[in-house]
Amino acid sequence: MKNKILNNIFMSLVLICTLLLTACVDQYQGEKNKKTDIGEKRIIVTSVAVAQITDLLDLDLVGVTDTTSFKLPKRYENVQRVGMPMGPDIEIIRSLKPTEVLSPSSLKSYLEEQFKQAKIPYRFVNMSSVGAMYDSIDEIAKEYGKEDKSAKLREEYESLLKEYEQKRKDKKKPKVLILMGLPGSFVVATNNSYVGNLTELAGGENVIHDDNEEFLPVNTEELVKLNPDIILRTSHTMSEEVMEEFDEEFKTNDIWKHFDAVKNNKVYNLDNNYFGMTATMGYKEGLKKLDEIFYKEQ
């Protein structure tokens, strides 16, 4: 158990460094196999979020990620597992002879070189925001002849956006600080992060803006000057442990007592099933939750 926790902490720290040093906001495509008929496509997916997309597009898989925290779509329950998202088993993937491996672009720095060396055809799927996710859905649908399904998904998405724009047009935007927790540490989510994007879609104003980065190191002395109305706390992994660490941080670090959000009991813990590192189709539930938090008193 101890080794598992230490391993999670190590992987989380590596992820922080990656997110702070690189901006994975584009799609990338590796060496592709010669085009075959759609029925011969052999697709592997290395994250649950991407598996949600392929499920909605009615695509079969020959390989899918392992997961301990999130639930795979039912149609993939008996599909060959290929290892965890940040460390897939390259030999298993090669043995399945994929025509394409789909991975989230946030893991590009971990996986691209491995895929290249193994001569595995790949595509990195941009899921840095809800809009980017739908653009990716359109591209995948075009590749596999599922445009009818992506068009319906796009229509539902645009209708939902209009609904939220209408709901919040006469309401005051709350100033929001978003903290993303990992075992042993936490970072601040900017407007470029998925959680930051979701906050803005729900009508909140993220107090932390950056032109490039999704996450930034925490500087509480600077954050207190921004004096957010609301503080949101979520996690990348190990949610229960991370939330306990957040509680300890807020109890023992006196600076948090100077935030109006803390004084007014406006600190909220979020479910990382809907508020994680990358966009997922669970964003609709996320919007509902944020709407309750932001506007329940208006």
Protein language model annotation of sequence segments:
Residues 2-13:
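Bacterial N-terminal signal peptides that target proteins for export
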Residues 21-23:
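C-terminal motif of bacterial Sec signal peptides marking the signal peptidase cleavage site
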Residues 25-27:
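Bacterial signal peptide processing site
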Residues 36-57, 149-202:
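Basic- and aromatic-lined ligand-binding clefts that recognize polyanionic substrates
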Residues 41-42, 134-144, 151, 155, ...:
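Structured C-terminal subdomain patch of bacterial secreted/periplasmic proteins
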Residues 45-96, 100-105:
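A short, structured surface patch at a secondary-structure boundary
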Residues 68-71, 187-215:
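Alpha-helical, coiled-coil/dimerization segments enriched in small aliphatic residues
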Residues 90-103, 120, 220-233:
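Proline-aspartate-enriched helix->loop->beta-strand connector
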